[in-house]
Amino acid sequence: MPDDASDLADRVQAGDLRLYELDDETDADTAAAARRAVLERETDADTDALGAFAFDADQAADTAVENLTGGAQLPLGVAGPVALSGGAADGEYYLPMATTEGALVASVNRGCSAITAAGGANARVTKTGMTRAPVFRVADVTEGAEVAQWADDNTDALAAAAESTTSHGELTDVTPYVVGDNVYLRFRYDTKDAMGMNMATIATEAASELVEDETPAELVAVSGNLCTDKKPAAINAVEGRGRTVTADVTIPQDVVEERFDTTPAAIEEANTRKNLIGSAKAGSLGFNAHAANVVAAVFLATGQDAAQVVEGANAITTVEARDDALYASVNLASLEVGTVGGGTTLPTQREALDVLGVRGGGDPAGANADALAEIIAVGALAGEINLLAALASRRLSAAHADLGR
């Protein structure tokens, strides 16, 4: 530890400095070392591993985290390659997955192998749009209806106000909802290759000022939870948020039997009774086996917002036993991804995006984020097929035992 880091830690413990004030005293690396020193002294923890990180401390402190103390590392594996024909992604892809769940990468890898043996999966982004829904206070429902009508009649003016804050985002629609003396306006934006949450928030604040200037409505909060961000929500399942993407594949029966030791009919029954009926009985918004596993692992590997796995797991898996084949699909209703900004600028996350060939802005704009969404959807499909097959063949517990997990 540098002497100055130790001295700074002394000052923190003496009450002369707060942890967040260390950034004003020195560079980010030294400030992080000082924070680790404070933690070691006050908790008796060993923080050597926290201090062994590969990213640039100054960049991380400026853009990613406050009170930078170190780095958290996760094992990263790759599944694939998996063949994919999409609207933006086309070819064979290795899927980088950061996880601590043993057997997950092996599970997805097995599904990828079957998909590729079948000639590859199809994938399409069918809807895009990051949303933000401010809530306004009005006198009563009559006034609320008038504000909602004003919003419907003045979409162009709202777009001009919102788009004045960004050179990339475009307002695509505004949907009003009136609940008593509350008016919610759900703004939807095309944020191109950015995940776009910050962009949408800043743009919506500007549009909300126009609403207040032109109507009796008073802004209470720029987010009224009808967006809906980082929470399970039916509106995201129905209307979508981020990217709505579907992947599907038809796998010949002989491939199913050879690779999974089961039949298309058995996999279909497992899906119907588990993912559809079981999920309905549970009141689940996710009618799938474990789509969140793949979404979370790829999100961590590629620098996405990990909390938005909540929306990403909003998925429906369908399976049909067709003539001598298995048809399977996964629809992810609200997958929020980006290939620019945020965590995508960190070095290991940049490399993972490079493995997929989608780092940075796409040509046309939005193409790289679309491609990432399609790749994740195919990865989720691979995971769904393999887990359902393992359940149908009663091999799930044996697979975990074989891998020592």
UniProtKB/Swiss-Prot annotation:
Gene Ontology BP, a term: coenzyme A metabolic process
Chief localisation class: cytoplasm
Gene3D superfamilies: 3-hydroxy-3-methylglutaryl-coenzyme A Reductase, Chain A, domain 2, Hydroxymethylglutaryl-CoA reductase, class I/II, NAD/NADP-binding domain
Regulation of protein activity: Is competitively inhibited by lovastatin (formerly called mevinolin). Lovastatin also blocks the growth of H.salinarum, and this effect is reversed by addition of mevalonate, indicating the critical role that the mevalonate pathway plays in isoprenoid biosynthesis by these archaea.
GO cellular component: a single term: cytoplasm
Active site: 101, 305, 400
SUPFAM superfamilies found in the cross-reference section: NAD-binding domain of HMG-CoA reductase (SSF55035), Substrate-binding domain of HMG-CoA reductase (SSF56542)
Annotated catalysed reactions: (R)-mevalonate + 2 NADP(+) + CoA = (3S)-3-hydroxy-3-methylglutaryl-CoA + 2 NADPH + 2 H(+)
GO molecular function: hydroxymethylglutaryl-CoA reductase (NADPH) activity
Superkingdom, taxonomy of origin: Archaea
UniProt-listed Enzyme Commission number(s): 1.1.1.34
Compartments, record wording: Cytoplasm
Keywords linked to the UniProt accession: Cytoplasm, Isoprene biosynthesis, Lipid biosynthesis, Lipid metabolism, NADP, Oxidoreductase
Pathway the protein takes part in: Metabolic intermediate biosynthesis; (R)-mevalonate biosynthesis; (R)-mevalonate from acetyl-CoA: step 3/3
Subunit structure: Homodimer.
NCBIfam families reported in the protein's UniProt record: HMG_CoA_R_NADP
Family: Belongs to the HMG-CoA reductase family.
Protein function: Catalyzes the NADPH-dependent reductive deacylation of (S)-3-hydroxy-3-methylglutaryl-CoA (HMG-CoA) to (R)-mevalonate. Cannot use NADH instead of NADPH. Functions in the mevalonate (MVA) pathway leading to isopentenyl diphosphate (IPP), a key precursor for the biosynthesis of isoprenoid compounds such as archaeal membrane lipids.
Record protein name field: 3-hydroxy-3-methylglutaryl-coenzyme A reductase
Organism encoding this protein: Halobacterium salinarum (strain ATCC 29341 / DSM 671 / R1)
Gene name linked to the record: hmgA
